[in-house]
Regions:
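Intrinsically disordered, low-complexity segments enriched in polar/charged residues with Gly/Pro
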Residues: 1-2, 75
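An N-terminal, well-structured beta->alpha segment
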Residues: 1, 7-44
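Glycine-rich phosphate-binding loops that contact phosphosugars or nucleotide phosphates
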Residues: 43-124
Length: 124
């Protein structure tokens, strides 16, 4: 049996190339003015920077919150499904809430959006 071994490094290099291309395209789609406004909101936040989502968007929000916390920004993740069952109480008036959603029409987020507006300083 003379089976040819796959070249894992070549496969990894192709994956890296695709990821670099995707990030390059993403950076072209981001509105620079809005991005800077969000950064200013986070930097000037007197409370917590709260990141909320559900599903895959929630996973990204949780990771982003963790990264913010590790850089000294007061931040925590709020699962949208849990929020409607009591966790909204963790939101305070000086907090900034950043909602992660692929569609912008997630039922769990829509259901609690009005309550969130009453509790925090700003929603992104």
């Amino acid at each position: 049996m003379n089976k040819k071994s796959p070249n894992y490094f070549t496969s990894a290099r192709k994956t890296f190339s695709k990821e670099i291309h995707s990030l390059s395209n993403l950076s072209k789609k981001i509105n620079q003015k809005k991005y800077n406004e969000i950064c200013e909101l986070i930097l000037n936040c007197k409370g917590n920077t709260v990141l909320m989502g559900i599903g895959k968007s929630g996973s990204i929000a949780a990771k982003t919150s963790s990264t913010l916390s590790s850089t000294g920004t007061s931040s925590f993740f709020l699962n949208a499904a849990e929020a409607s069952h009591g966790d909204l109480g963790s939101l305070k008036k000086n907090d900034v809430l950043i909602i992660f959603s692929f569609s912008g029409e997630t039922e769990e987020i829509i259901k609690i959006f009005s309550a969130c507006k009453l509790k925090v300083k700003k929603i992104v």
